[in-house]
Amino acid sequence: MKHIVKNIHFVGIGGAGMSGIAEVLLNLGYKVSGSDVGNNAATRRLASLGATVMHGHDAANVTGANAVVVSTAVSGDNPEVLAARSKRIPVVPRAVMLAELMRLKQGVAIAGTHGKTTTTSLVASVLAEGGLDPTFVIGGRLNSAGANARLGTGDFIVAEADESDASFLNLFPVIEVITNIDADHMDTYGHDFARLKQAFIEFTQRLPFYGIAVLCVDDPNVREILPFVSKPVVRYGFAEDAQIRAVDARAVDGQMHFTVQRQLNGHTEPPLEIVLNLPGLHNVQNALAAIAIATELEVPDAAIVKALREFHGVGRRFQRYGEVATPDGAGTFTLVDDYGHHPVEMAATLAAARGAFPGRRLVLAFQPHRFTRTRDCFEDFVKVLGTVDALLLSEVYAAGEAPIVAADGRALTRALRVAGKVEPVFVEQMEEMPQAILDAVRPGDVVVTMGAGSIGAVPGQLVSHQQSTQSTQGGQA
């Protein structure tokens, strides 16, 4: 195919999933171009690697392309998509291009409603430490690699499998992980949870007879589909029937310490004493998936232990920004940023924050993501948001959706006030959020910024504000 397709264009190249695929294709020797409405770290990195990145969408951008890659976030009336179709240039969904990359190697696909990015990162890190040098495509920046994708020399490619648009059914990996199954992106499945579960069953049918499905049996919905999975299964979790099982898990100084018991292929493997450089029981489960795969692939135990102990995390997944001074100069607060935007993953992250910073006041700055999700999970949002000590709530990040009555930020604010668990502060514009946080904090607080939209820029703005303040004060001194 390479002698036919040489120039590949990405519409929305700065997106997490798109930029990773673009980087791997660059490393494979393809000429890559792309467009996006904004400039971010991903577009800057791709440009530095040789990609041609254009600001804004224009029909002329696809000139010379042999294929145009699009994600589901790109509408059908995008001028570049229309131009490609008029010129008979193949328009390739992102998941189909990922599937083509997987055909070059043995695929390890990480699926599930929550935890995909962290689990994919843990798997890639453990395999790399074991000397397998995997290729990886991740939906977040792997801090140890400084990128969300890399072309390795080994036999495996590790990637996220996206159920949001059912595109994971395009993949044919040899190893699959299902972390959990929850009601999200239900528009794709006609608001029928049974259809969503059936899609995950069909996902496991993509495995070859020699493949394995690595399933978290702590999740009741994963356990429910277990009898319908016909391919070999490895069960992981805290449950007694898990083959890769964590026991004695405890939080210690922002890390998780636990013992792993392993029963695979009728053999009892030596237990592992793990120190995971991430907080939260949910991350213990994510690490168990990586341990299961590593054990199957005969990665040395010492490499597994070392990789998890030295794991540097993923961008916007409980990303610690350290201590930031309070405006009154009386002390500091701890700043953490997280991508969580579904009530289940939010609850897990907030529980991890409580465990990592016991006894401290927890301040949450949250930007809801999508009106449909806010509508569908409204009561669950009210419940989880009511567990924090102080709350700053913004308007919904639309992600291209039209507003829905009674499913916006103000509606959530009103419902939280009625519930009476916490008194929310509604922040109209995201530009006002950094100052709103500074107005709300006290010395010793833990501040978590959370959401999948533009709130991701807020932690950097807070850090920059502190640096500029210190610089000004230093100059005055």
From Swiss-Prot:
It comes from the Bacteria. GO terms for cellular component: cytoplasm. ATP binds at G112, T113, H114, G115, K116, T117, T118. Its EC number is 6.3.2.8. Pfam families: Mur_ligase, Mur_ligase_C, Mur_ligase_M. Keywords: ATP-binding, Cell cycle, Cell division, Cell shape, Cell wall biogenesis/degradation, Cytoplasm, Ligase, Nucleotide-binding, Peptidoglycan synthesis. It is found in: Cytoplasm. Its main location: cytoplasm. InterPro entries: Mur-like_cat_sf (IPR036565), Mur_ligase_C (IPR004101), Mur_ligase_C_dom_sf (IPR036615), Mur_ligase_cen (IPR013221), Mur_ligase_N (IPR000713), MurCDEF_pg_biosynth (IPR050061), UDP-N-AcMur_Ala_ligase_MurC (IPR005758). SUPFAM superfamilies: MurCD N-terminal domain, MurD-like peptide ligases, catalytic domain, MurD-like peptide ligases, peptide-binding domain. It is an enzyme of class 6 (ligase). Pathway: Cell wall biogenesis; peptidoglycan biosynthesis. One of its GO terms (biological process) is peptidoglycan biosynthetic process. Belongs to the MurCDEF family. This is UDP-N-acetylmuramate--L-alanine ligase. It comes from Cupriavidus necator (strain ATCC 17699 / DSM 428 / KCTC 22496 / NCIMB 10442 / H16 / Stanier 337) (Ralstonia eutropha).
